[in-house]
Amino acid sequence: MNIVVLFGGTSPEREISLKSGENIAATLRARGHQVETLDTAVPNFVEQLMQLKPDCVFPALHGADGEDGKIQGLLSILHIPYVGSDVRASVITMDKYLTKLVALQSGIPTPSFIYVYDPHLVPDYWDVERKLGSPFIVKPCDVGSTIGLSLVRSASEYEVALEEAFRFSDRLLLEEFIDGFEVTVGLFRLGGDFLVLPPIYVVKPDRIFDYDTKYKPGGAKHVYDLPISVEARERLTSYSKRICKIVGIGGVARLDYIVKDETPYLLEINSIPGMTAESLVPDEVRHAGRDFGEFLEDLIKDAL
């Protein structure tokens, strides 16, 4: 099969996208597929894509222009089959505010929050503390990999956190900090149903699962022995399937939760999760006893 892997792009997550794309391409080539990689940052990438005439496109793009529905819209216009979620699901999951609204409407717990939609209308620190408690989280509304995220404990830290977050987006989420443990759930669509991969308890050296912890060697441990009850684990599965069905997730997705007192709180949905050799979803696939190459082929079959 002739497959084009789209990677790179211009978002702050470019480095991870390149690694994800190379891992996907190498794995599919090893299984006998004809695979080309194409960086969407090059000016004429659409022309190059059309010249390649792929049977299927495998987007490995993270962040803006990759997970926000734009590339999905382009591929739909060009009538090229592609792996993953459609425009609607991509738009919703890329926007942390919209994701939270869907979660609340679906009966899925999520940390309390304040939506900042205008840089000139930012609430006072003390108002935020009264509503969300201290510490609280400041993060861009539409950037992944915890880029621009800060844990705020004081008014002075709040100013610094706002400046950092506004570097990446003009819309922010101020979010309640729940001091629990982080769990990530991978799932993928196959034959009209969602199959849930083994959840991972992310053991991190600090209170925040930040960029360095996610992607640098030795940053975090992946533990499959979750310190929760069977009932709480079932809620993780139920919540994940429910919201992915409502949103319309396609291909594979990763959902991040914080768990406290047996209650999972949804943080975000990643419609194009990292696919590097060290990423969470490939690890979950291996732990489930599946071959990663076969898994990628299943995603392609679902797209065709």
From Swiss-Prot:
Q: Name one GO cellular component term.
A: cytoplasm
Q: Which UniProt keywords apply?
A: ATP-binding, Cell shape, Cell wall biogenesis/degradation, Cytoplasm, Ligase, Magnesium, Manganese, Metal-binding, Nucleotide-binding, Peptidoglycan synthesis
| Enzyme class at the top of the EC tree | ligase
Reactions it catalyzes: 2 D-alanine + ATP = D-alanyl-D-alanine + ADP + phosphate + H(+)
The domain of life for this entry's organism is Bacteria
UniProt-listed Enzyme Commission number(s): 6.3.2.4
Annotated residues for binding of Mg(2+) 1: 256, 268
Cofactor note text? Binds 2 magnesium or manganese ions per subunit.
Which BP terms does GO give this entry?
cell wall organization; peptidoglycan biosynthetic process; regulation of cell shape
Q: Where is the ATP-grasp domain?
A: 100-301
Q: Which GO terms describe its molecular function?
A: ATP binding; D-alanine-D-alanine ligase activity; metal ion binding
Instruction: State the function annotated in the UniProt record.
Output: Cell wall formation.
Q: Return the similarity comment.
A: Belongs to the D-alanine--D-alanine ligase family.
Write the protein's name: D-alanine--D-alanine ligase
What is the organism of origin for this protein? Answer: Coprothermobacter proteolyticus (strain ATCC 35245 / DSM 5265 / OCM 4 / BT)
